[in-house]
Amino acid sequence: MEKCREYVCKDNKNVQKKSNYEWDKVDKNTTNNCSKESHNQWGYNPITGEEKKSDEEIKSAKQQDKKDFSERDSLSVINLSGGKDSTALLILMIEKELPIDIVINADPWMEFPEMYEHLERVDEYLYRERGIHITTLRHPKGFEWLMFEEPKKRSSAIQKRIEMGVSLYGNGWPGFKVRWCTGQLKIKLIDAEIQRMKTEKRVLHHIGIAADEVQRCKEKQYPLVEWGITEAKALQICYDHGFDFGGLYKKYHRASCWCCPFQRISELRNLRKYHPQLWKQLMEMDQRAKEQFGSGALGQFKQRWSIEGLENRFAQEEKPRLILP
């Protein structure tokens, strides 16, 4: 039986192909090990309700894509985070029959289990519609290694750590001044892959930023802005096509990493309520950070709040209040 996933794991030196995505929270023995025939066991698309393409139609579409690709002077690349905006971008580009050569996703290792399941469904949808799979980039060591174990190499950084009296290893909690998580786990990997692609062809890099987030736009392609698709519209497009993100957007403002220090207090309250195991893991990470980096910025999860402090606050909120007559 042929593996129906093939992803690219990239570090700074080489590109390594893997036949399975290393998702701890997803059953690898189900959707990842499917045959070509399993994509066409129904006569319709269960996500859109539309009639499915036959094997012959998919083969013909692939051949046409190859022909179109060879005739075009650029690669059409979609940056898929998996959130509502980038998912809506992918859906609309498919529906508008715009060229899509490569869809890349940078996995920060700390997504919600529901997000990994969502990406599985999006990958199946992409394969059915365009005959390609998501290409996933991963840092070879991951978030926790970067947070606690990455050795400091620059003499200035080492000297500063010595003066602070903290560990010479790890970056601590990400902060507004040093948001190393996004840089190391997403931007750096994606930029390196885009630069590699540019050695072959010109690249049109499409990013899913909504029309009401126009301040984030710089020099790349932002179709949602051009089409006037707001965040609310993007989410509705996803819902209309059967992508509900496992209910994440009903509990959280953004479906970002579950350990993100930039979450709202209300989101952290919901993390404790709806994902108690992740909350427990976050408490352990925060305790380790305090022991390794102290009470300074590196060891502080959120300004004015530690996870232990939030645990006490949330527990206090749950206690029944005495109502006086």
Spans of features found by a protein language model:
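Intrinsically disordered, low-complexity, charge-rich segments with an acidic bias
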Residues: 10-41, 52-59
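Nucleotide-activated chemistry modules centered on ATP-dependent adenylation/adenylyltransferase
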Residues: 59-325
